[in-house]
């Protein structure tokens, strides 16, 4: 939990392996540490910087511009490399925008939604002029209220001079200086997390994780809701992880921490959509304002091809969305229909 007027620094490999000195200068141990950039770069100093500080979040430097599919790939790369549990994951969007502000906004929103779907609170970081020129930040706030972290330095003398505050709606944190390192102040209290109390304790042995209830029993061959999350335990009481489960003729997916997935999930190279009960959806899926099609055979999302549904043919874009104006070199047999 961070409160109004708390301070923190954000760090990357630029700050080196030893950040104890700048933490002491700042008078805090709070950090937001860079994890990744694009889909290949990882901060080589990450482990050391995490060990020396108290991370309140992590950030990813985006290179996806206005490409939603690339934003999804970058978000997944970011999520796959989060080293420890935190509340906030940050989209650092300050370079390589496309010339289309709406496309940029859509890509940012998709990235942030994947962060939210994974159980984190998404934050948008940039500076005011760049944001006003390239992103509709009000759309971001409509979906993720109070999610902005904005840089604005004024005299950049190391002090938080509110005469130079970059006034915008929805700012949670302000990066007020980069001299001699990035300095930040919290403007809004964290909301209290309402996490259900668990009625037992997680245990681990050489075979995996299991859950010991307070009365000494443990779940097996069943679903169990623990801390507001559903898990499935096998016949020996071990939690299933990173695998598909067929139960009552429906398919479910358990994440690497055992939690049942709802919403979108990337398994291997394929996207799937799970409903609110966790069951895999086939056929048409309406998500936000877009339509997607999941195959009846395997449930994977169709992309960059025509599909036949009912009496009509539909074209699904490379990001899986139903095309408004399908483009093709050879019209398939049958009627082309666009919803």
From Swiss-Prot:
State a single Pfam family of this protein.
Choline_bind_1
- Which SMART domains does the entry link to? Glyco_25 (SM00641)
A Gene Ontology BP annotation from the UniProt entry: defense response to bacterium
Q: Which reaction does it catalyse?
A: Hydrolysis of (1->4)-beta-linkages between N-acetylmuramic acid and N-acetyl-D-glucosamine residues in a peptidoglycan and between N-acetyl-D-glucosamine residues in chitodextrins
Annotated Ch-type lysozyme domain residues? 5-201
Keyword annotations from UniProtKB, A to Z: Antimicrobial, Bacteriolytic enzyme, Glycosidase, Hydrolase, Repeat
Q: Which InterPro entries match?
A: Cell_wall/Cho-bd_repeat, Glyco_hydro_25, Glyco_hydro_25_AS, Glyco_hydro_fam25_subgr, Glycoside_hydrolase_SF
User: Can you say where the Cell wall-binding repeats lie in this chain?
Assistant: 200-219, 220-239, 241-260, 261-280, 281-300, 303-322
The UniProt similarity line reads:
Belongs to the glycosyl hydrolase 25 family.
Function in brief: Responsible for the separation of the host daughter cells at the end of cell division and participates in the liberation of progeny bacteriophage into the medium. Strictly depends on the presence of choline-containing cell walls for activity.
Q: What is this protein called?
A: Lysozyme
């Amino acid at each position: 939990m961070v409160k109004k007027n708390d301070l923190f620094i954000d760090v990357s490999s630029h700050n080196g392996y030893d950040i104890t000195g700048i933490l002491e200068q700042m008078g805090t141990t709070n950090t937001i540490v860079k994890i990744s950039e694009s889909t290949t770069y990882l901060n080589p100093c990450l482990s050391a910087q995490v060990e020396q500080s108290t991370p309140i979040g992590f950030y990813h430097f985006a290179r996806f511009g206005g490409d939603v599919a690339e934003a999804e790939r970058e978000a997944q790369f970011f999520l796959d490399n989060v080293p420890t549990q935190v509340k906030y994951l940050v989209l650092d969007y300050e370079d390589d925008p496309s010339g289309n502000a709406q496309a940029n906004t859509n890509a940012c929103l998709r990235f942030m939604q994947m962060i939210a779907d994974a159980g984190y609170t998404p934050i948008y970081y940039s500076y005011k002029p760049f944001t006003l020129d390239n992103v509709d930040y009000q759309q971001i706030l409509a979906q993720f209220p109070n999610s902005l972290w904005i840089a604005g330095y004024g005299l950049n003398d190391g002090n938080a001079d509110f005469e130079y505050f970059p006034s915008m709606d929805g700012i949670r944190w302000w990066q007020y200086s980069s001299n001699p390192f990035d300095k930040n102040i919290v403007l809004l209290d964290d909301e209290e997390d309402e996490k259900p109390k668990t009625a037992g304790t997680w245990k681990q042995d050489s075979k995996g994780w299991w859950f010991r209830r307070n009365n000494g029993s443990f779940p097996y061959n069943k679903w169990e809701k623990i801390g507001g999350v559903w898990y499935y335990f096998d016949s020996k009481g071990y939690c299933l992880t990173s695998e598909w489960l067929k139960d009552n003729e429906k398919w479910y997916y358990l994440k690497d921490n055992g939690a049942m997935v709802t919403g979108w999930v990337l398994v291997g190279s394929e996207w799937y959509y799970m409903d609110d009960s966790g069951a895999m959806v086939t056929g048409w899926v309406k998500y936000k304002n877009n339509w997607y099609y999941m195959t009846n055979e395997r449930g994977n999302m169709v992309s960059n091809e025509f599909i036949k549904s009912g009496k009509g043919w539909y074209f699904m874009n490379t990001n899986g969305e139903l095309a408004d104006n399908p483009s093709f070199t050879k019209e398939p047999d049958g009627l082309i229909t666009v919803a």
